[in-house]
Amino acid sequence: MKTSEERLVVPDSLSSDQAPAPVPQGSPVDENTDSEPVPQPCGGDDRSQVAADSVAGSVVFQEPQQGHPLPLSAPLEVEFNTPGELSPRIEEQELSENVSLPVEDTNQPELASGEDVEGVSEEPGPVDEGDAFWSYNFSQVPRYLSGSWSEFRAHSENFLKGCKWAPDGSCILTNSADNTLRIYNLPPELYSATEQVDYAEMVPVLRMVEGDTIYDYCWYSLMSSSQPDTSYVASSSRENPIHIWDAFTGELRASFRAYNHLDELTAAHSLCFSPDGSQLFCGFNRTVRVFSTSRPGRDCEVRATFAKKQGQSGIISCIAFSPSQPLYACGSYGRTLGLYAWDDGSPLALLGGHQGGITHLCFHPDGNLFFSGARKDAELLCWDLRQPGHLLWSLSREVTTNQRIYFDLDPSGQFLVSGNTNGMVSVWDISGAFGDSSKLGPVMTFLPQKDCTNGVSLHPSLPLLATASGQRMFPEPTNSGDEGEPEGDLPLLSLCHAHPEWQLQLWWCGGGPDPSSPNDPQDEKGQGRAEGCGDGLI
């Protein structure tokens, strides 16, 4: 646990008045009448051991014994009196939220010939205390900082399925093919007082294992590490209820159950907390179910998206809320987008235009624009809520499989970043593209690795880009190559041409030199070097 005297070393020498607090090492356990059985975490309740030793801190879900119900706390309640009002069971000293940062002069790097991308100013303006923010700068190739790869290469076919920063930026959540959610803290080297730092491989502080393939996962919308009662993760897996996990201990805190017309348990395909945290919206086949976060169980509101042969058909595969208007958008595997009123779910608009099932949605911070992406579809589409029937413009990317390929917007809404099946990461500057109906080209692309980049996530306050990679490998027919051997009826199958690179990577996107990384860590680890586009960029 970091103290208030420790200072954050910014790789590009940018300065601010506050660094994002790492996850505090504590968690409350409150009382509630509706309870769920949960396992006891490995290694007891010692929070300091969880942060120091990833193995000791890992939590593996096991079926709890009878007679040990877990009381669901009021953590999912969203009304708090003061930020410092924490559970009385938290005995550790809370991390100071005001971390002073050293002020250093920075020099803006020169752009390669032909580059016309504007970066951040050389000296960032003053920032209010408690509201630190660094701007993203994609005028040069992002610098590799750290990553995690050993965790995923221990088992075969354990590729990643996306990554998501916590709303407060204190940690990052990953999903992988071994049906495990992992939580990583920010690299401790960012808090080192030395200028020359060799970043070590990241290790997870928590592991939360689901029973089957994980369909979707998300952070609680009001999550803040300074308020442990808000630190939750929701996940949905095949033939299992929706689980709520404690992001401090990895314990299962609550479950939400949905049943079909035969009273059989059915799994949600998409999850999204409402902006105020009071409701959990879950996508099913032709249906959205709304659960109250203060009342776990099976009670929910059922909102049909398709009735009397009209409406949005197919499985609701993704849900996103507008940051400025009381509405939400739903994407379905039926290749349609639906806009609905938040209060009662009444349909507002139905849009089409994708070639495949919708896999991801994202609203612009201004609330007027939203973006959609689909599987086996080479376009990201931009829509304007002021003209819902009119497609504003499209962005080209490579998506050749059914895998969910994420994209993300930076907090200012200037840059949109997306992964590709070929491993490339594409960056678009959309700040000046409004009103232009033509296709917008990327300002920069780089190659983190040779495998599919399926997950990208931009930090909410630091210029940090997280990427997740990997995909399912299918054997390809090949010849034996041995002379004299009779050819069989069936061709041989081989993975000799596959290059699996399953890893989580962190990239600094703030521009300027990186004094904390004197050597290129990718060359030392044998990873592919990132390259740019244009004259100095690819």
Curated annotation (Swiss-Prot):
Composition bias, Acidic residues: 113-128
Coiled-coil intervals: none
InterPro entries from the UniProt entry: SWT21/TCAB1_mRNA_Telomere, WD40/YVTN_repeat-like_dom_sf, WD40_repeat_CS, WD40_repeat_dom_sf, WD40_rpt
Gene Ontology BP, a term: positive regulation of establishment of protein localization to telomere
Phosphoserine modification, residue list: S27, S87, S480
GO molecular function, one term: protein carrier chaperone
WD repeats: 154-194, 210-255, 260-301, 311-352, 353-393, 399-438
Region entry Disordered, spans: 1-53, 92-128, 471-491, 509-538
Subunit structure: Component of the telomerase holoenzyme complex composed of one molecule of TERT, one molecule of WRAP53/TCAB1, two molecules of H/ACA ribonucleoprotein complex subunits DKC1, NOP10, NHP2 and GAR1, and a telomerase RNA template component (TERC). The telomerase holoenzyme complex is associated with TEP1, SMG6/EST1A and POT1. Interacts with the chaperonin-containing T-complex (TRiC) complex; which mediates the folding of WRAP53/TCAB1. Interacts with COIL. Interacts with SMN1. Interacts with RNF8. Interacts with histone H2AX.
Protein name: Telomerase Cajal body protein 1
Species classification: Eukaryota, Metazoa, Chordata, Craniata, Vertebrata
